Curated annotation (Swiss-Prot):
It catalyses: a deoxyribonucleotide-2'-deoxyribose-5'-monophosphate-DNA + H2O = a 5'-end 2'-deoxyribose-5'-monophosphate-DNA + a 3'-end 2'-deoxyribonucleotide-DNA + H(+); Exonucleolytic cleavage in the 3'- to 5'-direction to yield nucleoside 5'-phosphates; a 3'-end 2'-deoxyribonucleotide-3'-phosphoglycolate-DNA + H2O = 2-phosphoglycolate + a 3'-end 2'-deoxyribonucleotide-DNA + H(+); a 3'-end 2'-deoxyribonucleotide-8-oxoguanine-DNA + H2O = 8-oxo-dGMP + a 3'-end 2'-deoxyribonucleotide-DNA + H(+). The gene is APEX1. The record marks 309 as: Interaction with DNA substrate. The N-terminus contains the redox activity while the C-terminus exerts the DNA AP-endodeoxyribonuclease activity; both function are independent in their actions. An unconventional mitochondrial targeting sequence (MTS) is harbored within the C-terminus, that appears to be masked by the N-terminal sequence containing the nuclear localization signal (NLS), that probably blocks the interaction between the MTS and Tom proteins. The modification N6-acetyllysine is found at residues 6-7, 27, 31-32, 35, 197. The keyword Disulfide bond applies. Its EC number is 3.1.11.2, 3.1.21.-. Gene3D superfamilies: Endonuclease/exonuclease/phosphatase. This is DNA repair nuclease/redox regulator APEX1. Residues 16-38 have a biased composition (Basic and acidic residues). Residues 1-60 are annotated as: Disordered.
Amino acid sequence: MPKRGKKGAVAEDGDELKTEPEAKKSKTTAKKNDKEAAGEGPALYEDPPDQKTSPSGKPATLKICSWNVDGLRAWIKKKGLDWVKEEAPDILCLQETKCSENKLPAELQELPGLSHQYWSAPSDKEGYSGVGLLSRQCPLKVSYGIGEEEHDQEGRVIVAEFDSFVLVTAYVPNAGRGLVRLEYRQRWDEAFRRFLKGLASRKPLVLCGDLNVAHEEIDLRNPKGNKKNAGFTPQERQGFGELLQAVPLADSFRHLYPNTPYAYTFWTYMMNARSKNVGWRLDYFLLSHSLLTALCDSKIRSKALGSDHCPITLYLAL
């Protein structure tokens, strides 16, 4: 996720975080009220009803959810598990867990059916990064990382192989405030692309998680103000495009909803960004093209609270 700012810094929507004079605040509030009264309020996203059949009419047989929880323990305190129980996925993928496996909250054992649980976290950085994969069905095989030491120190990738597909959940490195990790991010993108291409050559692939990039201008509220910010630099967008082409993979949400605006999965905690829907689409389900005939729906659960990201859900008819 894009890093949170400080007072006087540039915010995720491109505005400078300043304290306005009271007179200016009053005028701004009045203008806002006038706009909302005229039906010109925040542009919100309404998740349409779930489509649970494939293009050929086959009913969905698999439901996968992915959520950047921004800290597993805090997310549980914010009732994130209540949403999971209601959504009832077959597989749940979590990113930015910030929790080592030996300190996992006991509440995770209460999740109905998701008894096969796999976790990865940095060995030397408590409270940083981390991913989890929880499944009803036992995978054929589970592995961790992408097989390159430089990129496997931060607990960012879990791979689970099932009968008809391989699932990868990832928390892709952020380029950082001031783009201090952009060069590393570019090396990661190249290595990750090679790794995924190898997986996809053997079995259809599903990649999900916080990929830390808004691919196109439609995927964030203020593209013009963020072209030099982490998550929307030309280098990151190009890297994402190369990933789609080289593996190859399809963006499941844009495949189904190519022109749907205001569909975001991340909002900074600052400046009431979520209530205004000033957000970014950073979380994805990417699929091998051979799985598109099985694609029923790709959902953004924007009303689910508990993190600065919202969960996303994929339906497949396998």
